[in-house]
Amino acid sequence: MKRTYHCFPTFLFLFFTLHSFSQTHTLSGTIKNRDSREFVSAVSIIIKGSTEGTFSDARGNFKLATGKPLPLTLVFSSIGFETQELEITGAADVEVELVPSSVLGEEIVVAATRTATRAMESPVTIERISAANIRNTPATSYYDMVTQLKGVDVTTSSLTFKTPSTRGFNYSGNTRLNQLVDGMDNQAPGLNFAVGNFTGLTELDVDNMELLPGASSALYGSGGVNGTLLINSKDPFKYQGLSFQIKTGMNHVDKSQRSKPGWYNDWSARWAKAFNNKFAFKVGFQLVQAKDWIANSTQDYDRLTRKVLPGSRQTDPNYDGINVYGDETNMRDNGLSMKSLAQLVQGQTRQGILDATGGMVDIVQTMNAALPAVPTQEQIGLFIGSLPEALQRPVTNMVPFYFGLRNNIIPEASASRTGYVESDMVNPNTLNFKLSGSLHYKITSDLEASLTGYFGTGNTVYTGSDRYSLRGAKIGQYKLELRSKSWFVRSYTTQENAGEAYNATITARRLNEAWKPSTQWFPEYVGAFVQARSMGADEAAAHAAARAFADQGRPAAGSDEFKQLFDKVRSTPIPAGGLFLDRSDLWMTEGQYNFKD
């Protein structure tokens, strides 16, 4: 027993000694700007001689748990401020005042050479937008800031679908400009170009954007002929805390497109948290709701010459309005004119009667001999009544075409179907919901693994060769990455689902065919035109009468019949309907090693 009592105090002494050596200190404090006395966020705090560290939050506060014994030295550094060292001898809160510095070209970018490079040392022009710029901008969204950069052109298809480009080359859906979000190609696989800011980062999670005007194919692939846009998210180790943002505004205040102004609402939130500078996560969402602008140009357009014409539906029978859909269907594109269509109808009827009578009856020659050039209705009725019953109906249908050709009153003109305006065919209510999140784990002080996901869905409008209404479209990007100081390996996938997206032009054309086929509509138009001309109407009045006659039965926009036909056609896949089917995906694995380091 005596021996046991001697060892027990020794064991206790060793236990408390070891415990004292492994004690954890929590160092905390506040960082301010010495001149303005404002809090400084995102300041890097590192224990000198080690890789342990943390970052200050939005209020300039920081906390750092360490097992290193006191005293120790903390190194404070941030872009725009002089680096400062502070010796810590106790666990009390400290207040650090950073001295602002203005050194041209000190900002670090990663765009020009895919490695960290100072702006003044970069061999190419770089346009950069920081988180502070985004926070202070009056623009509707951070993506709109890109349109204000030097040398940038932009095509706006809708509020959430904007296509930037550089060097004077631009069009809607630009396949010549790369857009990378955290290193992932942000293009929609089925479209081969980025869908603006429809999917990707929420506004509160954007750390910076970098634009390389001009060719960057050697660095970022063949899609970068006209430039590359890099959008980088915030590091959850560096930017922690809960953030919430609400933007509200109004548009259409001039009431030129709508009877009353519309609301623009943008809600977003972000939450990030780090644990012992080892594990961190972040989640975020953004919801945008607005009344989009309506494409309402009714100018006449010639698709062959690609020129705007000085005409309208009242003056041009072959009218094709820019934002009027369905009127693209016309006689000319089917290889016909009003006159050739009349000749076709007469020729088919004539040949049919010749075949039926064994070549005994040439109805055209018979009518030439039996009827005057301008007969009365009574004369026409008597002639048809004298024919065999089997011939009466086809001859009755041929009569207006025959007399139109005989009297040379049918022009070599084309006529188009009557279309519907965009507000009848496209839902102008914008909806965009984005959800993002990531998990980060530092395997060692120089090796980090991360799992990231971005998802976007909603309604928007895209203008290409036609006008597309993207309803319920969904795009998701998911990435697994292993990154060190001098190398990285990443694999990611992009999953695209077009949802109920449809082509407004094809939908309108198919809707017209559904209520009356063009094979019926065009002959009715020509026949009614001849009748109107025979009664003394001029060409303009005859065209108006012909359209009114051929459009009998046309469903009015907004009517129950229209809605039923519209829903049926837009949900039928192209080419039978207007539904744009797209279930594409992209898989990518890439790596990089910097031999310089």
Regions found by a protein language model. Name each.
Residues L204-D207, A218-L230, D235-R303, L431-F433:
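Outer-membrane beta-barrel translocator/receptor signature
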Residues A92-E97, Y142-M145, K162-G168, L177-D182, ...:
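N-terminal periplasmic accessory domains that precede
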Residues T51-N61:
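Short, acidic Ser/Thr/Gly-rich low-complexity loop/linker segments typical of extracellular
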Residues R59-T66, D93-V94:
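Short, surface-exposed beta-strand/beta-hairpin micro-motifs centered on an aromatic residue
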Residues T30-S36, V43-K48, T73-F81, T89-R135:
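Short, acidic, small-residue-rich periplasmic hinge/interaction motif at the N-terminus
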Residues K63-A65, I126, Y143-A188, D207-N208:
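Extracytoplasmic beta-strand/coil segments of soluble accessory domains associated
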Residues P310-D597:
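Outer-membrane beta-barrel domain signature, strongest for Gram-negative TonB-dependent receptors
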Residues F62-A65, D185-P213, A269:
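Short acidic/polar hinge/loop motifs at secondary-structure boundaries
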